């Protein structure tokens, strides 16, 4: 069984989903899940995380996302992890140790790791997986998955207005800097 942790903003979620699709293609006879429990309200509230952006967005923005979310029972089989810090500590002490390969790839080391898609046994993947080499064999599946649904009436009117005029869009990414104690005060608009 393979589980890919999904966390971060939309771009990171798309990379992680793509990695899960690549895992599924490389291991067709094995179950592949994504772990979205970090977007759970209680987790966010307890750990006061501010890096979860708009929550889990893939299902909201793309109509062809096709991968199962790992239920807590699957996480327990692979990691003894329960989305509650206290219960996880108890589970790790009481339950038998799981023989799980835990793979964490730092976002700073954006290098391709040969063979990582074909690790045997239970594997929990945590990282951003932002290297195109992982997805070479599943390009078509990703193109089908990342299709926006048909715009609703309001958005269709906006699209028409934008295309019929000289429009400029500006995006200021200030949330990361406004809320983070590390970067506070850099962007104080």
Segments from the language model and where they lie:
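Extreme N-terminal starter segment of soluble prokaryotic enzymes
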Residues: 1-3
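A short, glycine/small-residue-rich beta-strand->loop->alpha-helix junction that serves as a flexible
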Residues: 5-15, 41-45
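Short, flexible loop/turn elements at secondary-structure junctions
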Residues: 6-10, 38, 129, 174-176
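Histidine-anchored nucleotide/phosphate-binding helix
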Residues: 13-25, 189
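Short, surface-exposed polybasic/aromatic micro-patch for ligand or macromolecular engagement
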Residues: 23, 37, 58-59
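Short, well-ordered coil loops that connect the C-terminus of an alpha-helix to the N-terminus
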Residues: 29-30, 64
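A short beta-strand-loop structural module common to alpha/beta enzyme folds
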Residues: 30-42
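Secretory-pathway luminal glycosyltransferase catalytic domains
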Residues: 48-189
């Amino acid at each position: 069984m393979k589980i890919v942790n999904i966390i971060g903003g939309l771009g990171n979620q798309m990379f992680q989903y793509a990695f899960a699709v690549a895992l599924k293609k490389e291991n067709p006879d094995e179950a592949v899940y994504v772990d979205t429990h970090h977007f759970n309200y209680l987790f966010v509230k307890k750990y006061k995380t501010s890096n979860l952006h708009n929550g889990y967005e893939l299902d909201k923005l793309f109509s062809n996302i096709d991968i199962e979310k790992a239920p807590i029972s699957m996480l327990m089989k692979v990691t003894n992890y329960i989305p509650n810090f206290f219960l996880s500590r108890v589970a790790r002490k009481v339950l038998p140790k799981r023989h799980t390969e835990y793979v964490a790839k730092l976002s700073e080391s954006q290098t391709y790791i040969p063979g990582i898609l074909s690790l045997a046994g239970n594997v929990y993947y945590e990282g951003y997986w932002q290297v195109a080499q992982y997805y070479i064999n599943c390009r078509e599946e990703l193109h089908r998955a990342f299709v926006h649904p048909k715009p609703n009436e309001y958005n269709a009117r906006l699209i028409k207005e934008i295309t019929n005029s000289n429009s400029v869009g500006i995006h200021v990414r200030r949330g990361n800097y406004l809320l983070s104690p590390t970067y506070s005060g850099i962007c104080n608009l």
